[in-house]
Amino acid sequence: GDVYKRQVRNIFIEDCKIDSCRNGIYFKSNLDRGGYFENLNMRRIEADVCLWGVINFRTNYHGYRGGNHPTLFRNICIEDVTCNRVDSVALMANGLPEAKLYNITLRNIKVKQAPKAIQMDNVVNLTLDNVEVNGKRITSAEQTD
C-alpha cells in the first residue's frame, strides 16, 4: 500500500510482467512511516517501459510531517529482471543518512535503454552481479555509506 507503517518480511515474488508504468519495482517511505521491509526476494520480472525507473528505492518520499520513525529496508534480492526502456534513471536507491538501505542485491538485471544507469545514496552492502544498462556492465555505483 501507499502508506504502510507495519512490518513486511519473508516475501517471495516471481514471474511478473509489466507493460508500461512509472516505476517497475518501487519501494517508498519517509521518516513518518516507520516499520520495516526485510527478507524480500523477487525474480523473473519483465518490464516494457518504466518512466522513472525499473528498480527504485526511495526513503525520502514527499509527505514528511516531521516524524522520526525511519523505515528499515534490509536483505532484499532482486534478480532476473529485464526492461526495454526507462525514461529516467534505470536503477535508483536513495536512502537517507538516518534511513539507510542494507544488504541490497541486484543480480542478472538488463535494461536496454536508459538516459542514466544508476544512482545510489546511503546504501550499505550493495551487490551488483551481472547488471547491464545500455549494453554496458555496471559493477559499482557512487554511493554514500
Where are these regions (language model features)?
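Short, small-residue-biased leader/transition segments that mark boundaries at the very start
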Residues: 1-4
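Eukaryotic acidic, Ser/Thr-rich intrinsically disordered low-complexity regions
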Residues: 123-145
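Repeat-solenoid scaffold signature
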Residues: 20-22, 29-36
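Short, T/G/N/S-enriched strand-turn elements that build extracellular solenoid repeat scaffolds
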Residues: 6, 15, 66-71, 93-95, ...
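Right-handed parallel beta-helix
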Residues: 7-20, 38-49, 74-84, 102-110, ...
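Structural detector of coil-to-beta-strand junctions
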Residues: 24-26, 54, 89-90, 117, ...
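Generic long, charged, amphipathic alpha-helical segments
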Residues: 54-55, 67-83, 88-91
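Mature catalytic domains of secreted/periplasmic carbohydrate-active enzymes
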Residues: 27-29, 57-62
